[in-house]
């Protein structure tokens, strides 16, 4: 082969390699190592619902609490562990994983009258911004 042709091919391959490396690796490394955004729960989009909001403090009447875990695009997330905390009463379930619809259901009872403030934590990392207030009388 001609030395000029070999030299041009070598320059081309080196230029192409440098361009490819600059294009691929110019982005932060965290972009390649982070979890997909679709799997990250959103503290804003996730929701808490309870029914009834007022219950008897007899230890028998249950308040059903539903937690819906969503990502930032409001898509339900499955298999996310939810831990509820309540300032009053007893949660019959705790540390439940969400179903295909992103839903986990808990039940709260109390023997003491007062106000229960309920918060939810997703995967021990993301606290849902919305909180519930349930009255036991």
List PLM regions with ranges.
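The feature marks long extracellular or luminal low-complexity segments
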Residues: 1-137
């Amino acid at each position: 082969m001609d030395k000029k042709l070999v030299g041009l091919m070598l320059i081309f391959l080196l230029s192409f390699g440098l361009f490819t490396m600059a294009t691929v690796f110019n982005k932060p490394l965290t972009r390649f190592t982070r979890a997909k955004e679709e799997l990250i729960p959103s503290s804003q989009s996730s929701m808490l619902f309870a029914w009834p909001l007022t219950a008897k403090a007899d230890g028998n009447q249950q308040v059903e609490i539903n937690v819906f875990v969503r990502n930032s695009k409001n898509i339900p997330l499955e298999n996310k562990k939810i831990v509820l905390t309540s300032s009053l009463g007893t949660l019959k379930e705790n540390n439940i994983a969400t179903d295909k619809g992103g839903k986990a259901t808990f039940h709260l009872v109390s023997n003491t009258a007062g106000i229960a403030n309920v918060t939810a934590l997703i995967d021990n990392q993301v606290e849902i911004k919305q909180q519930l207030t349930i009255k036991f009388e």
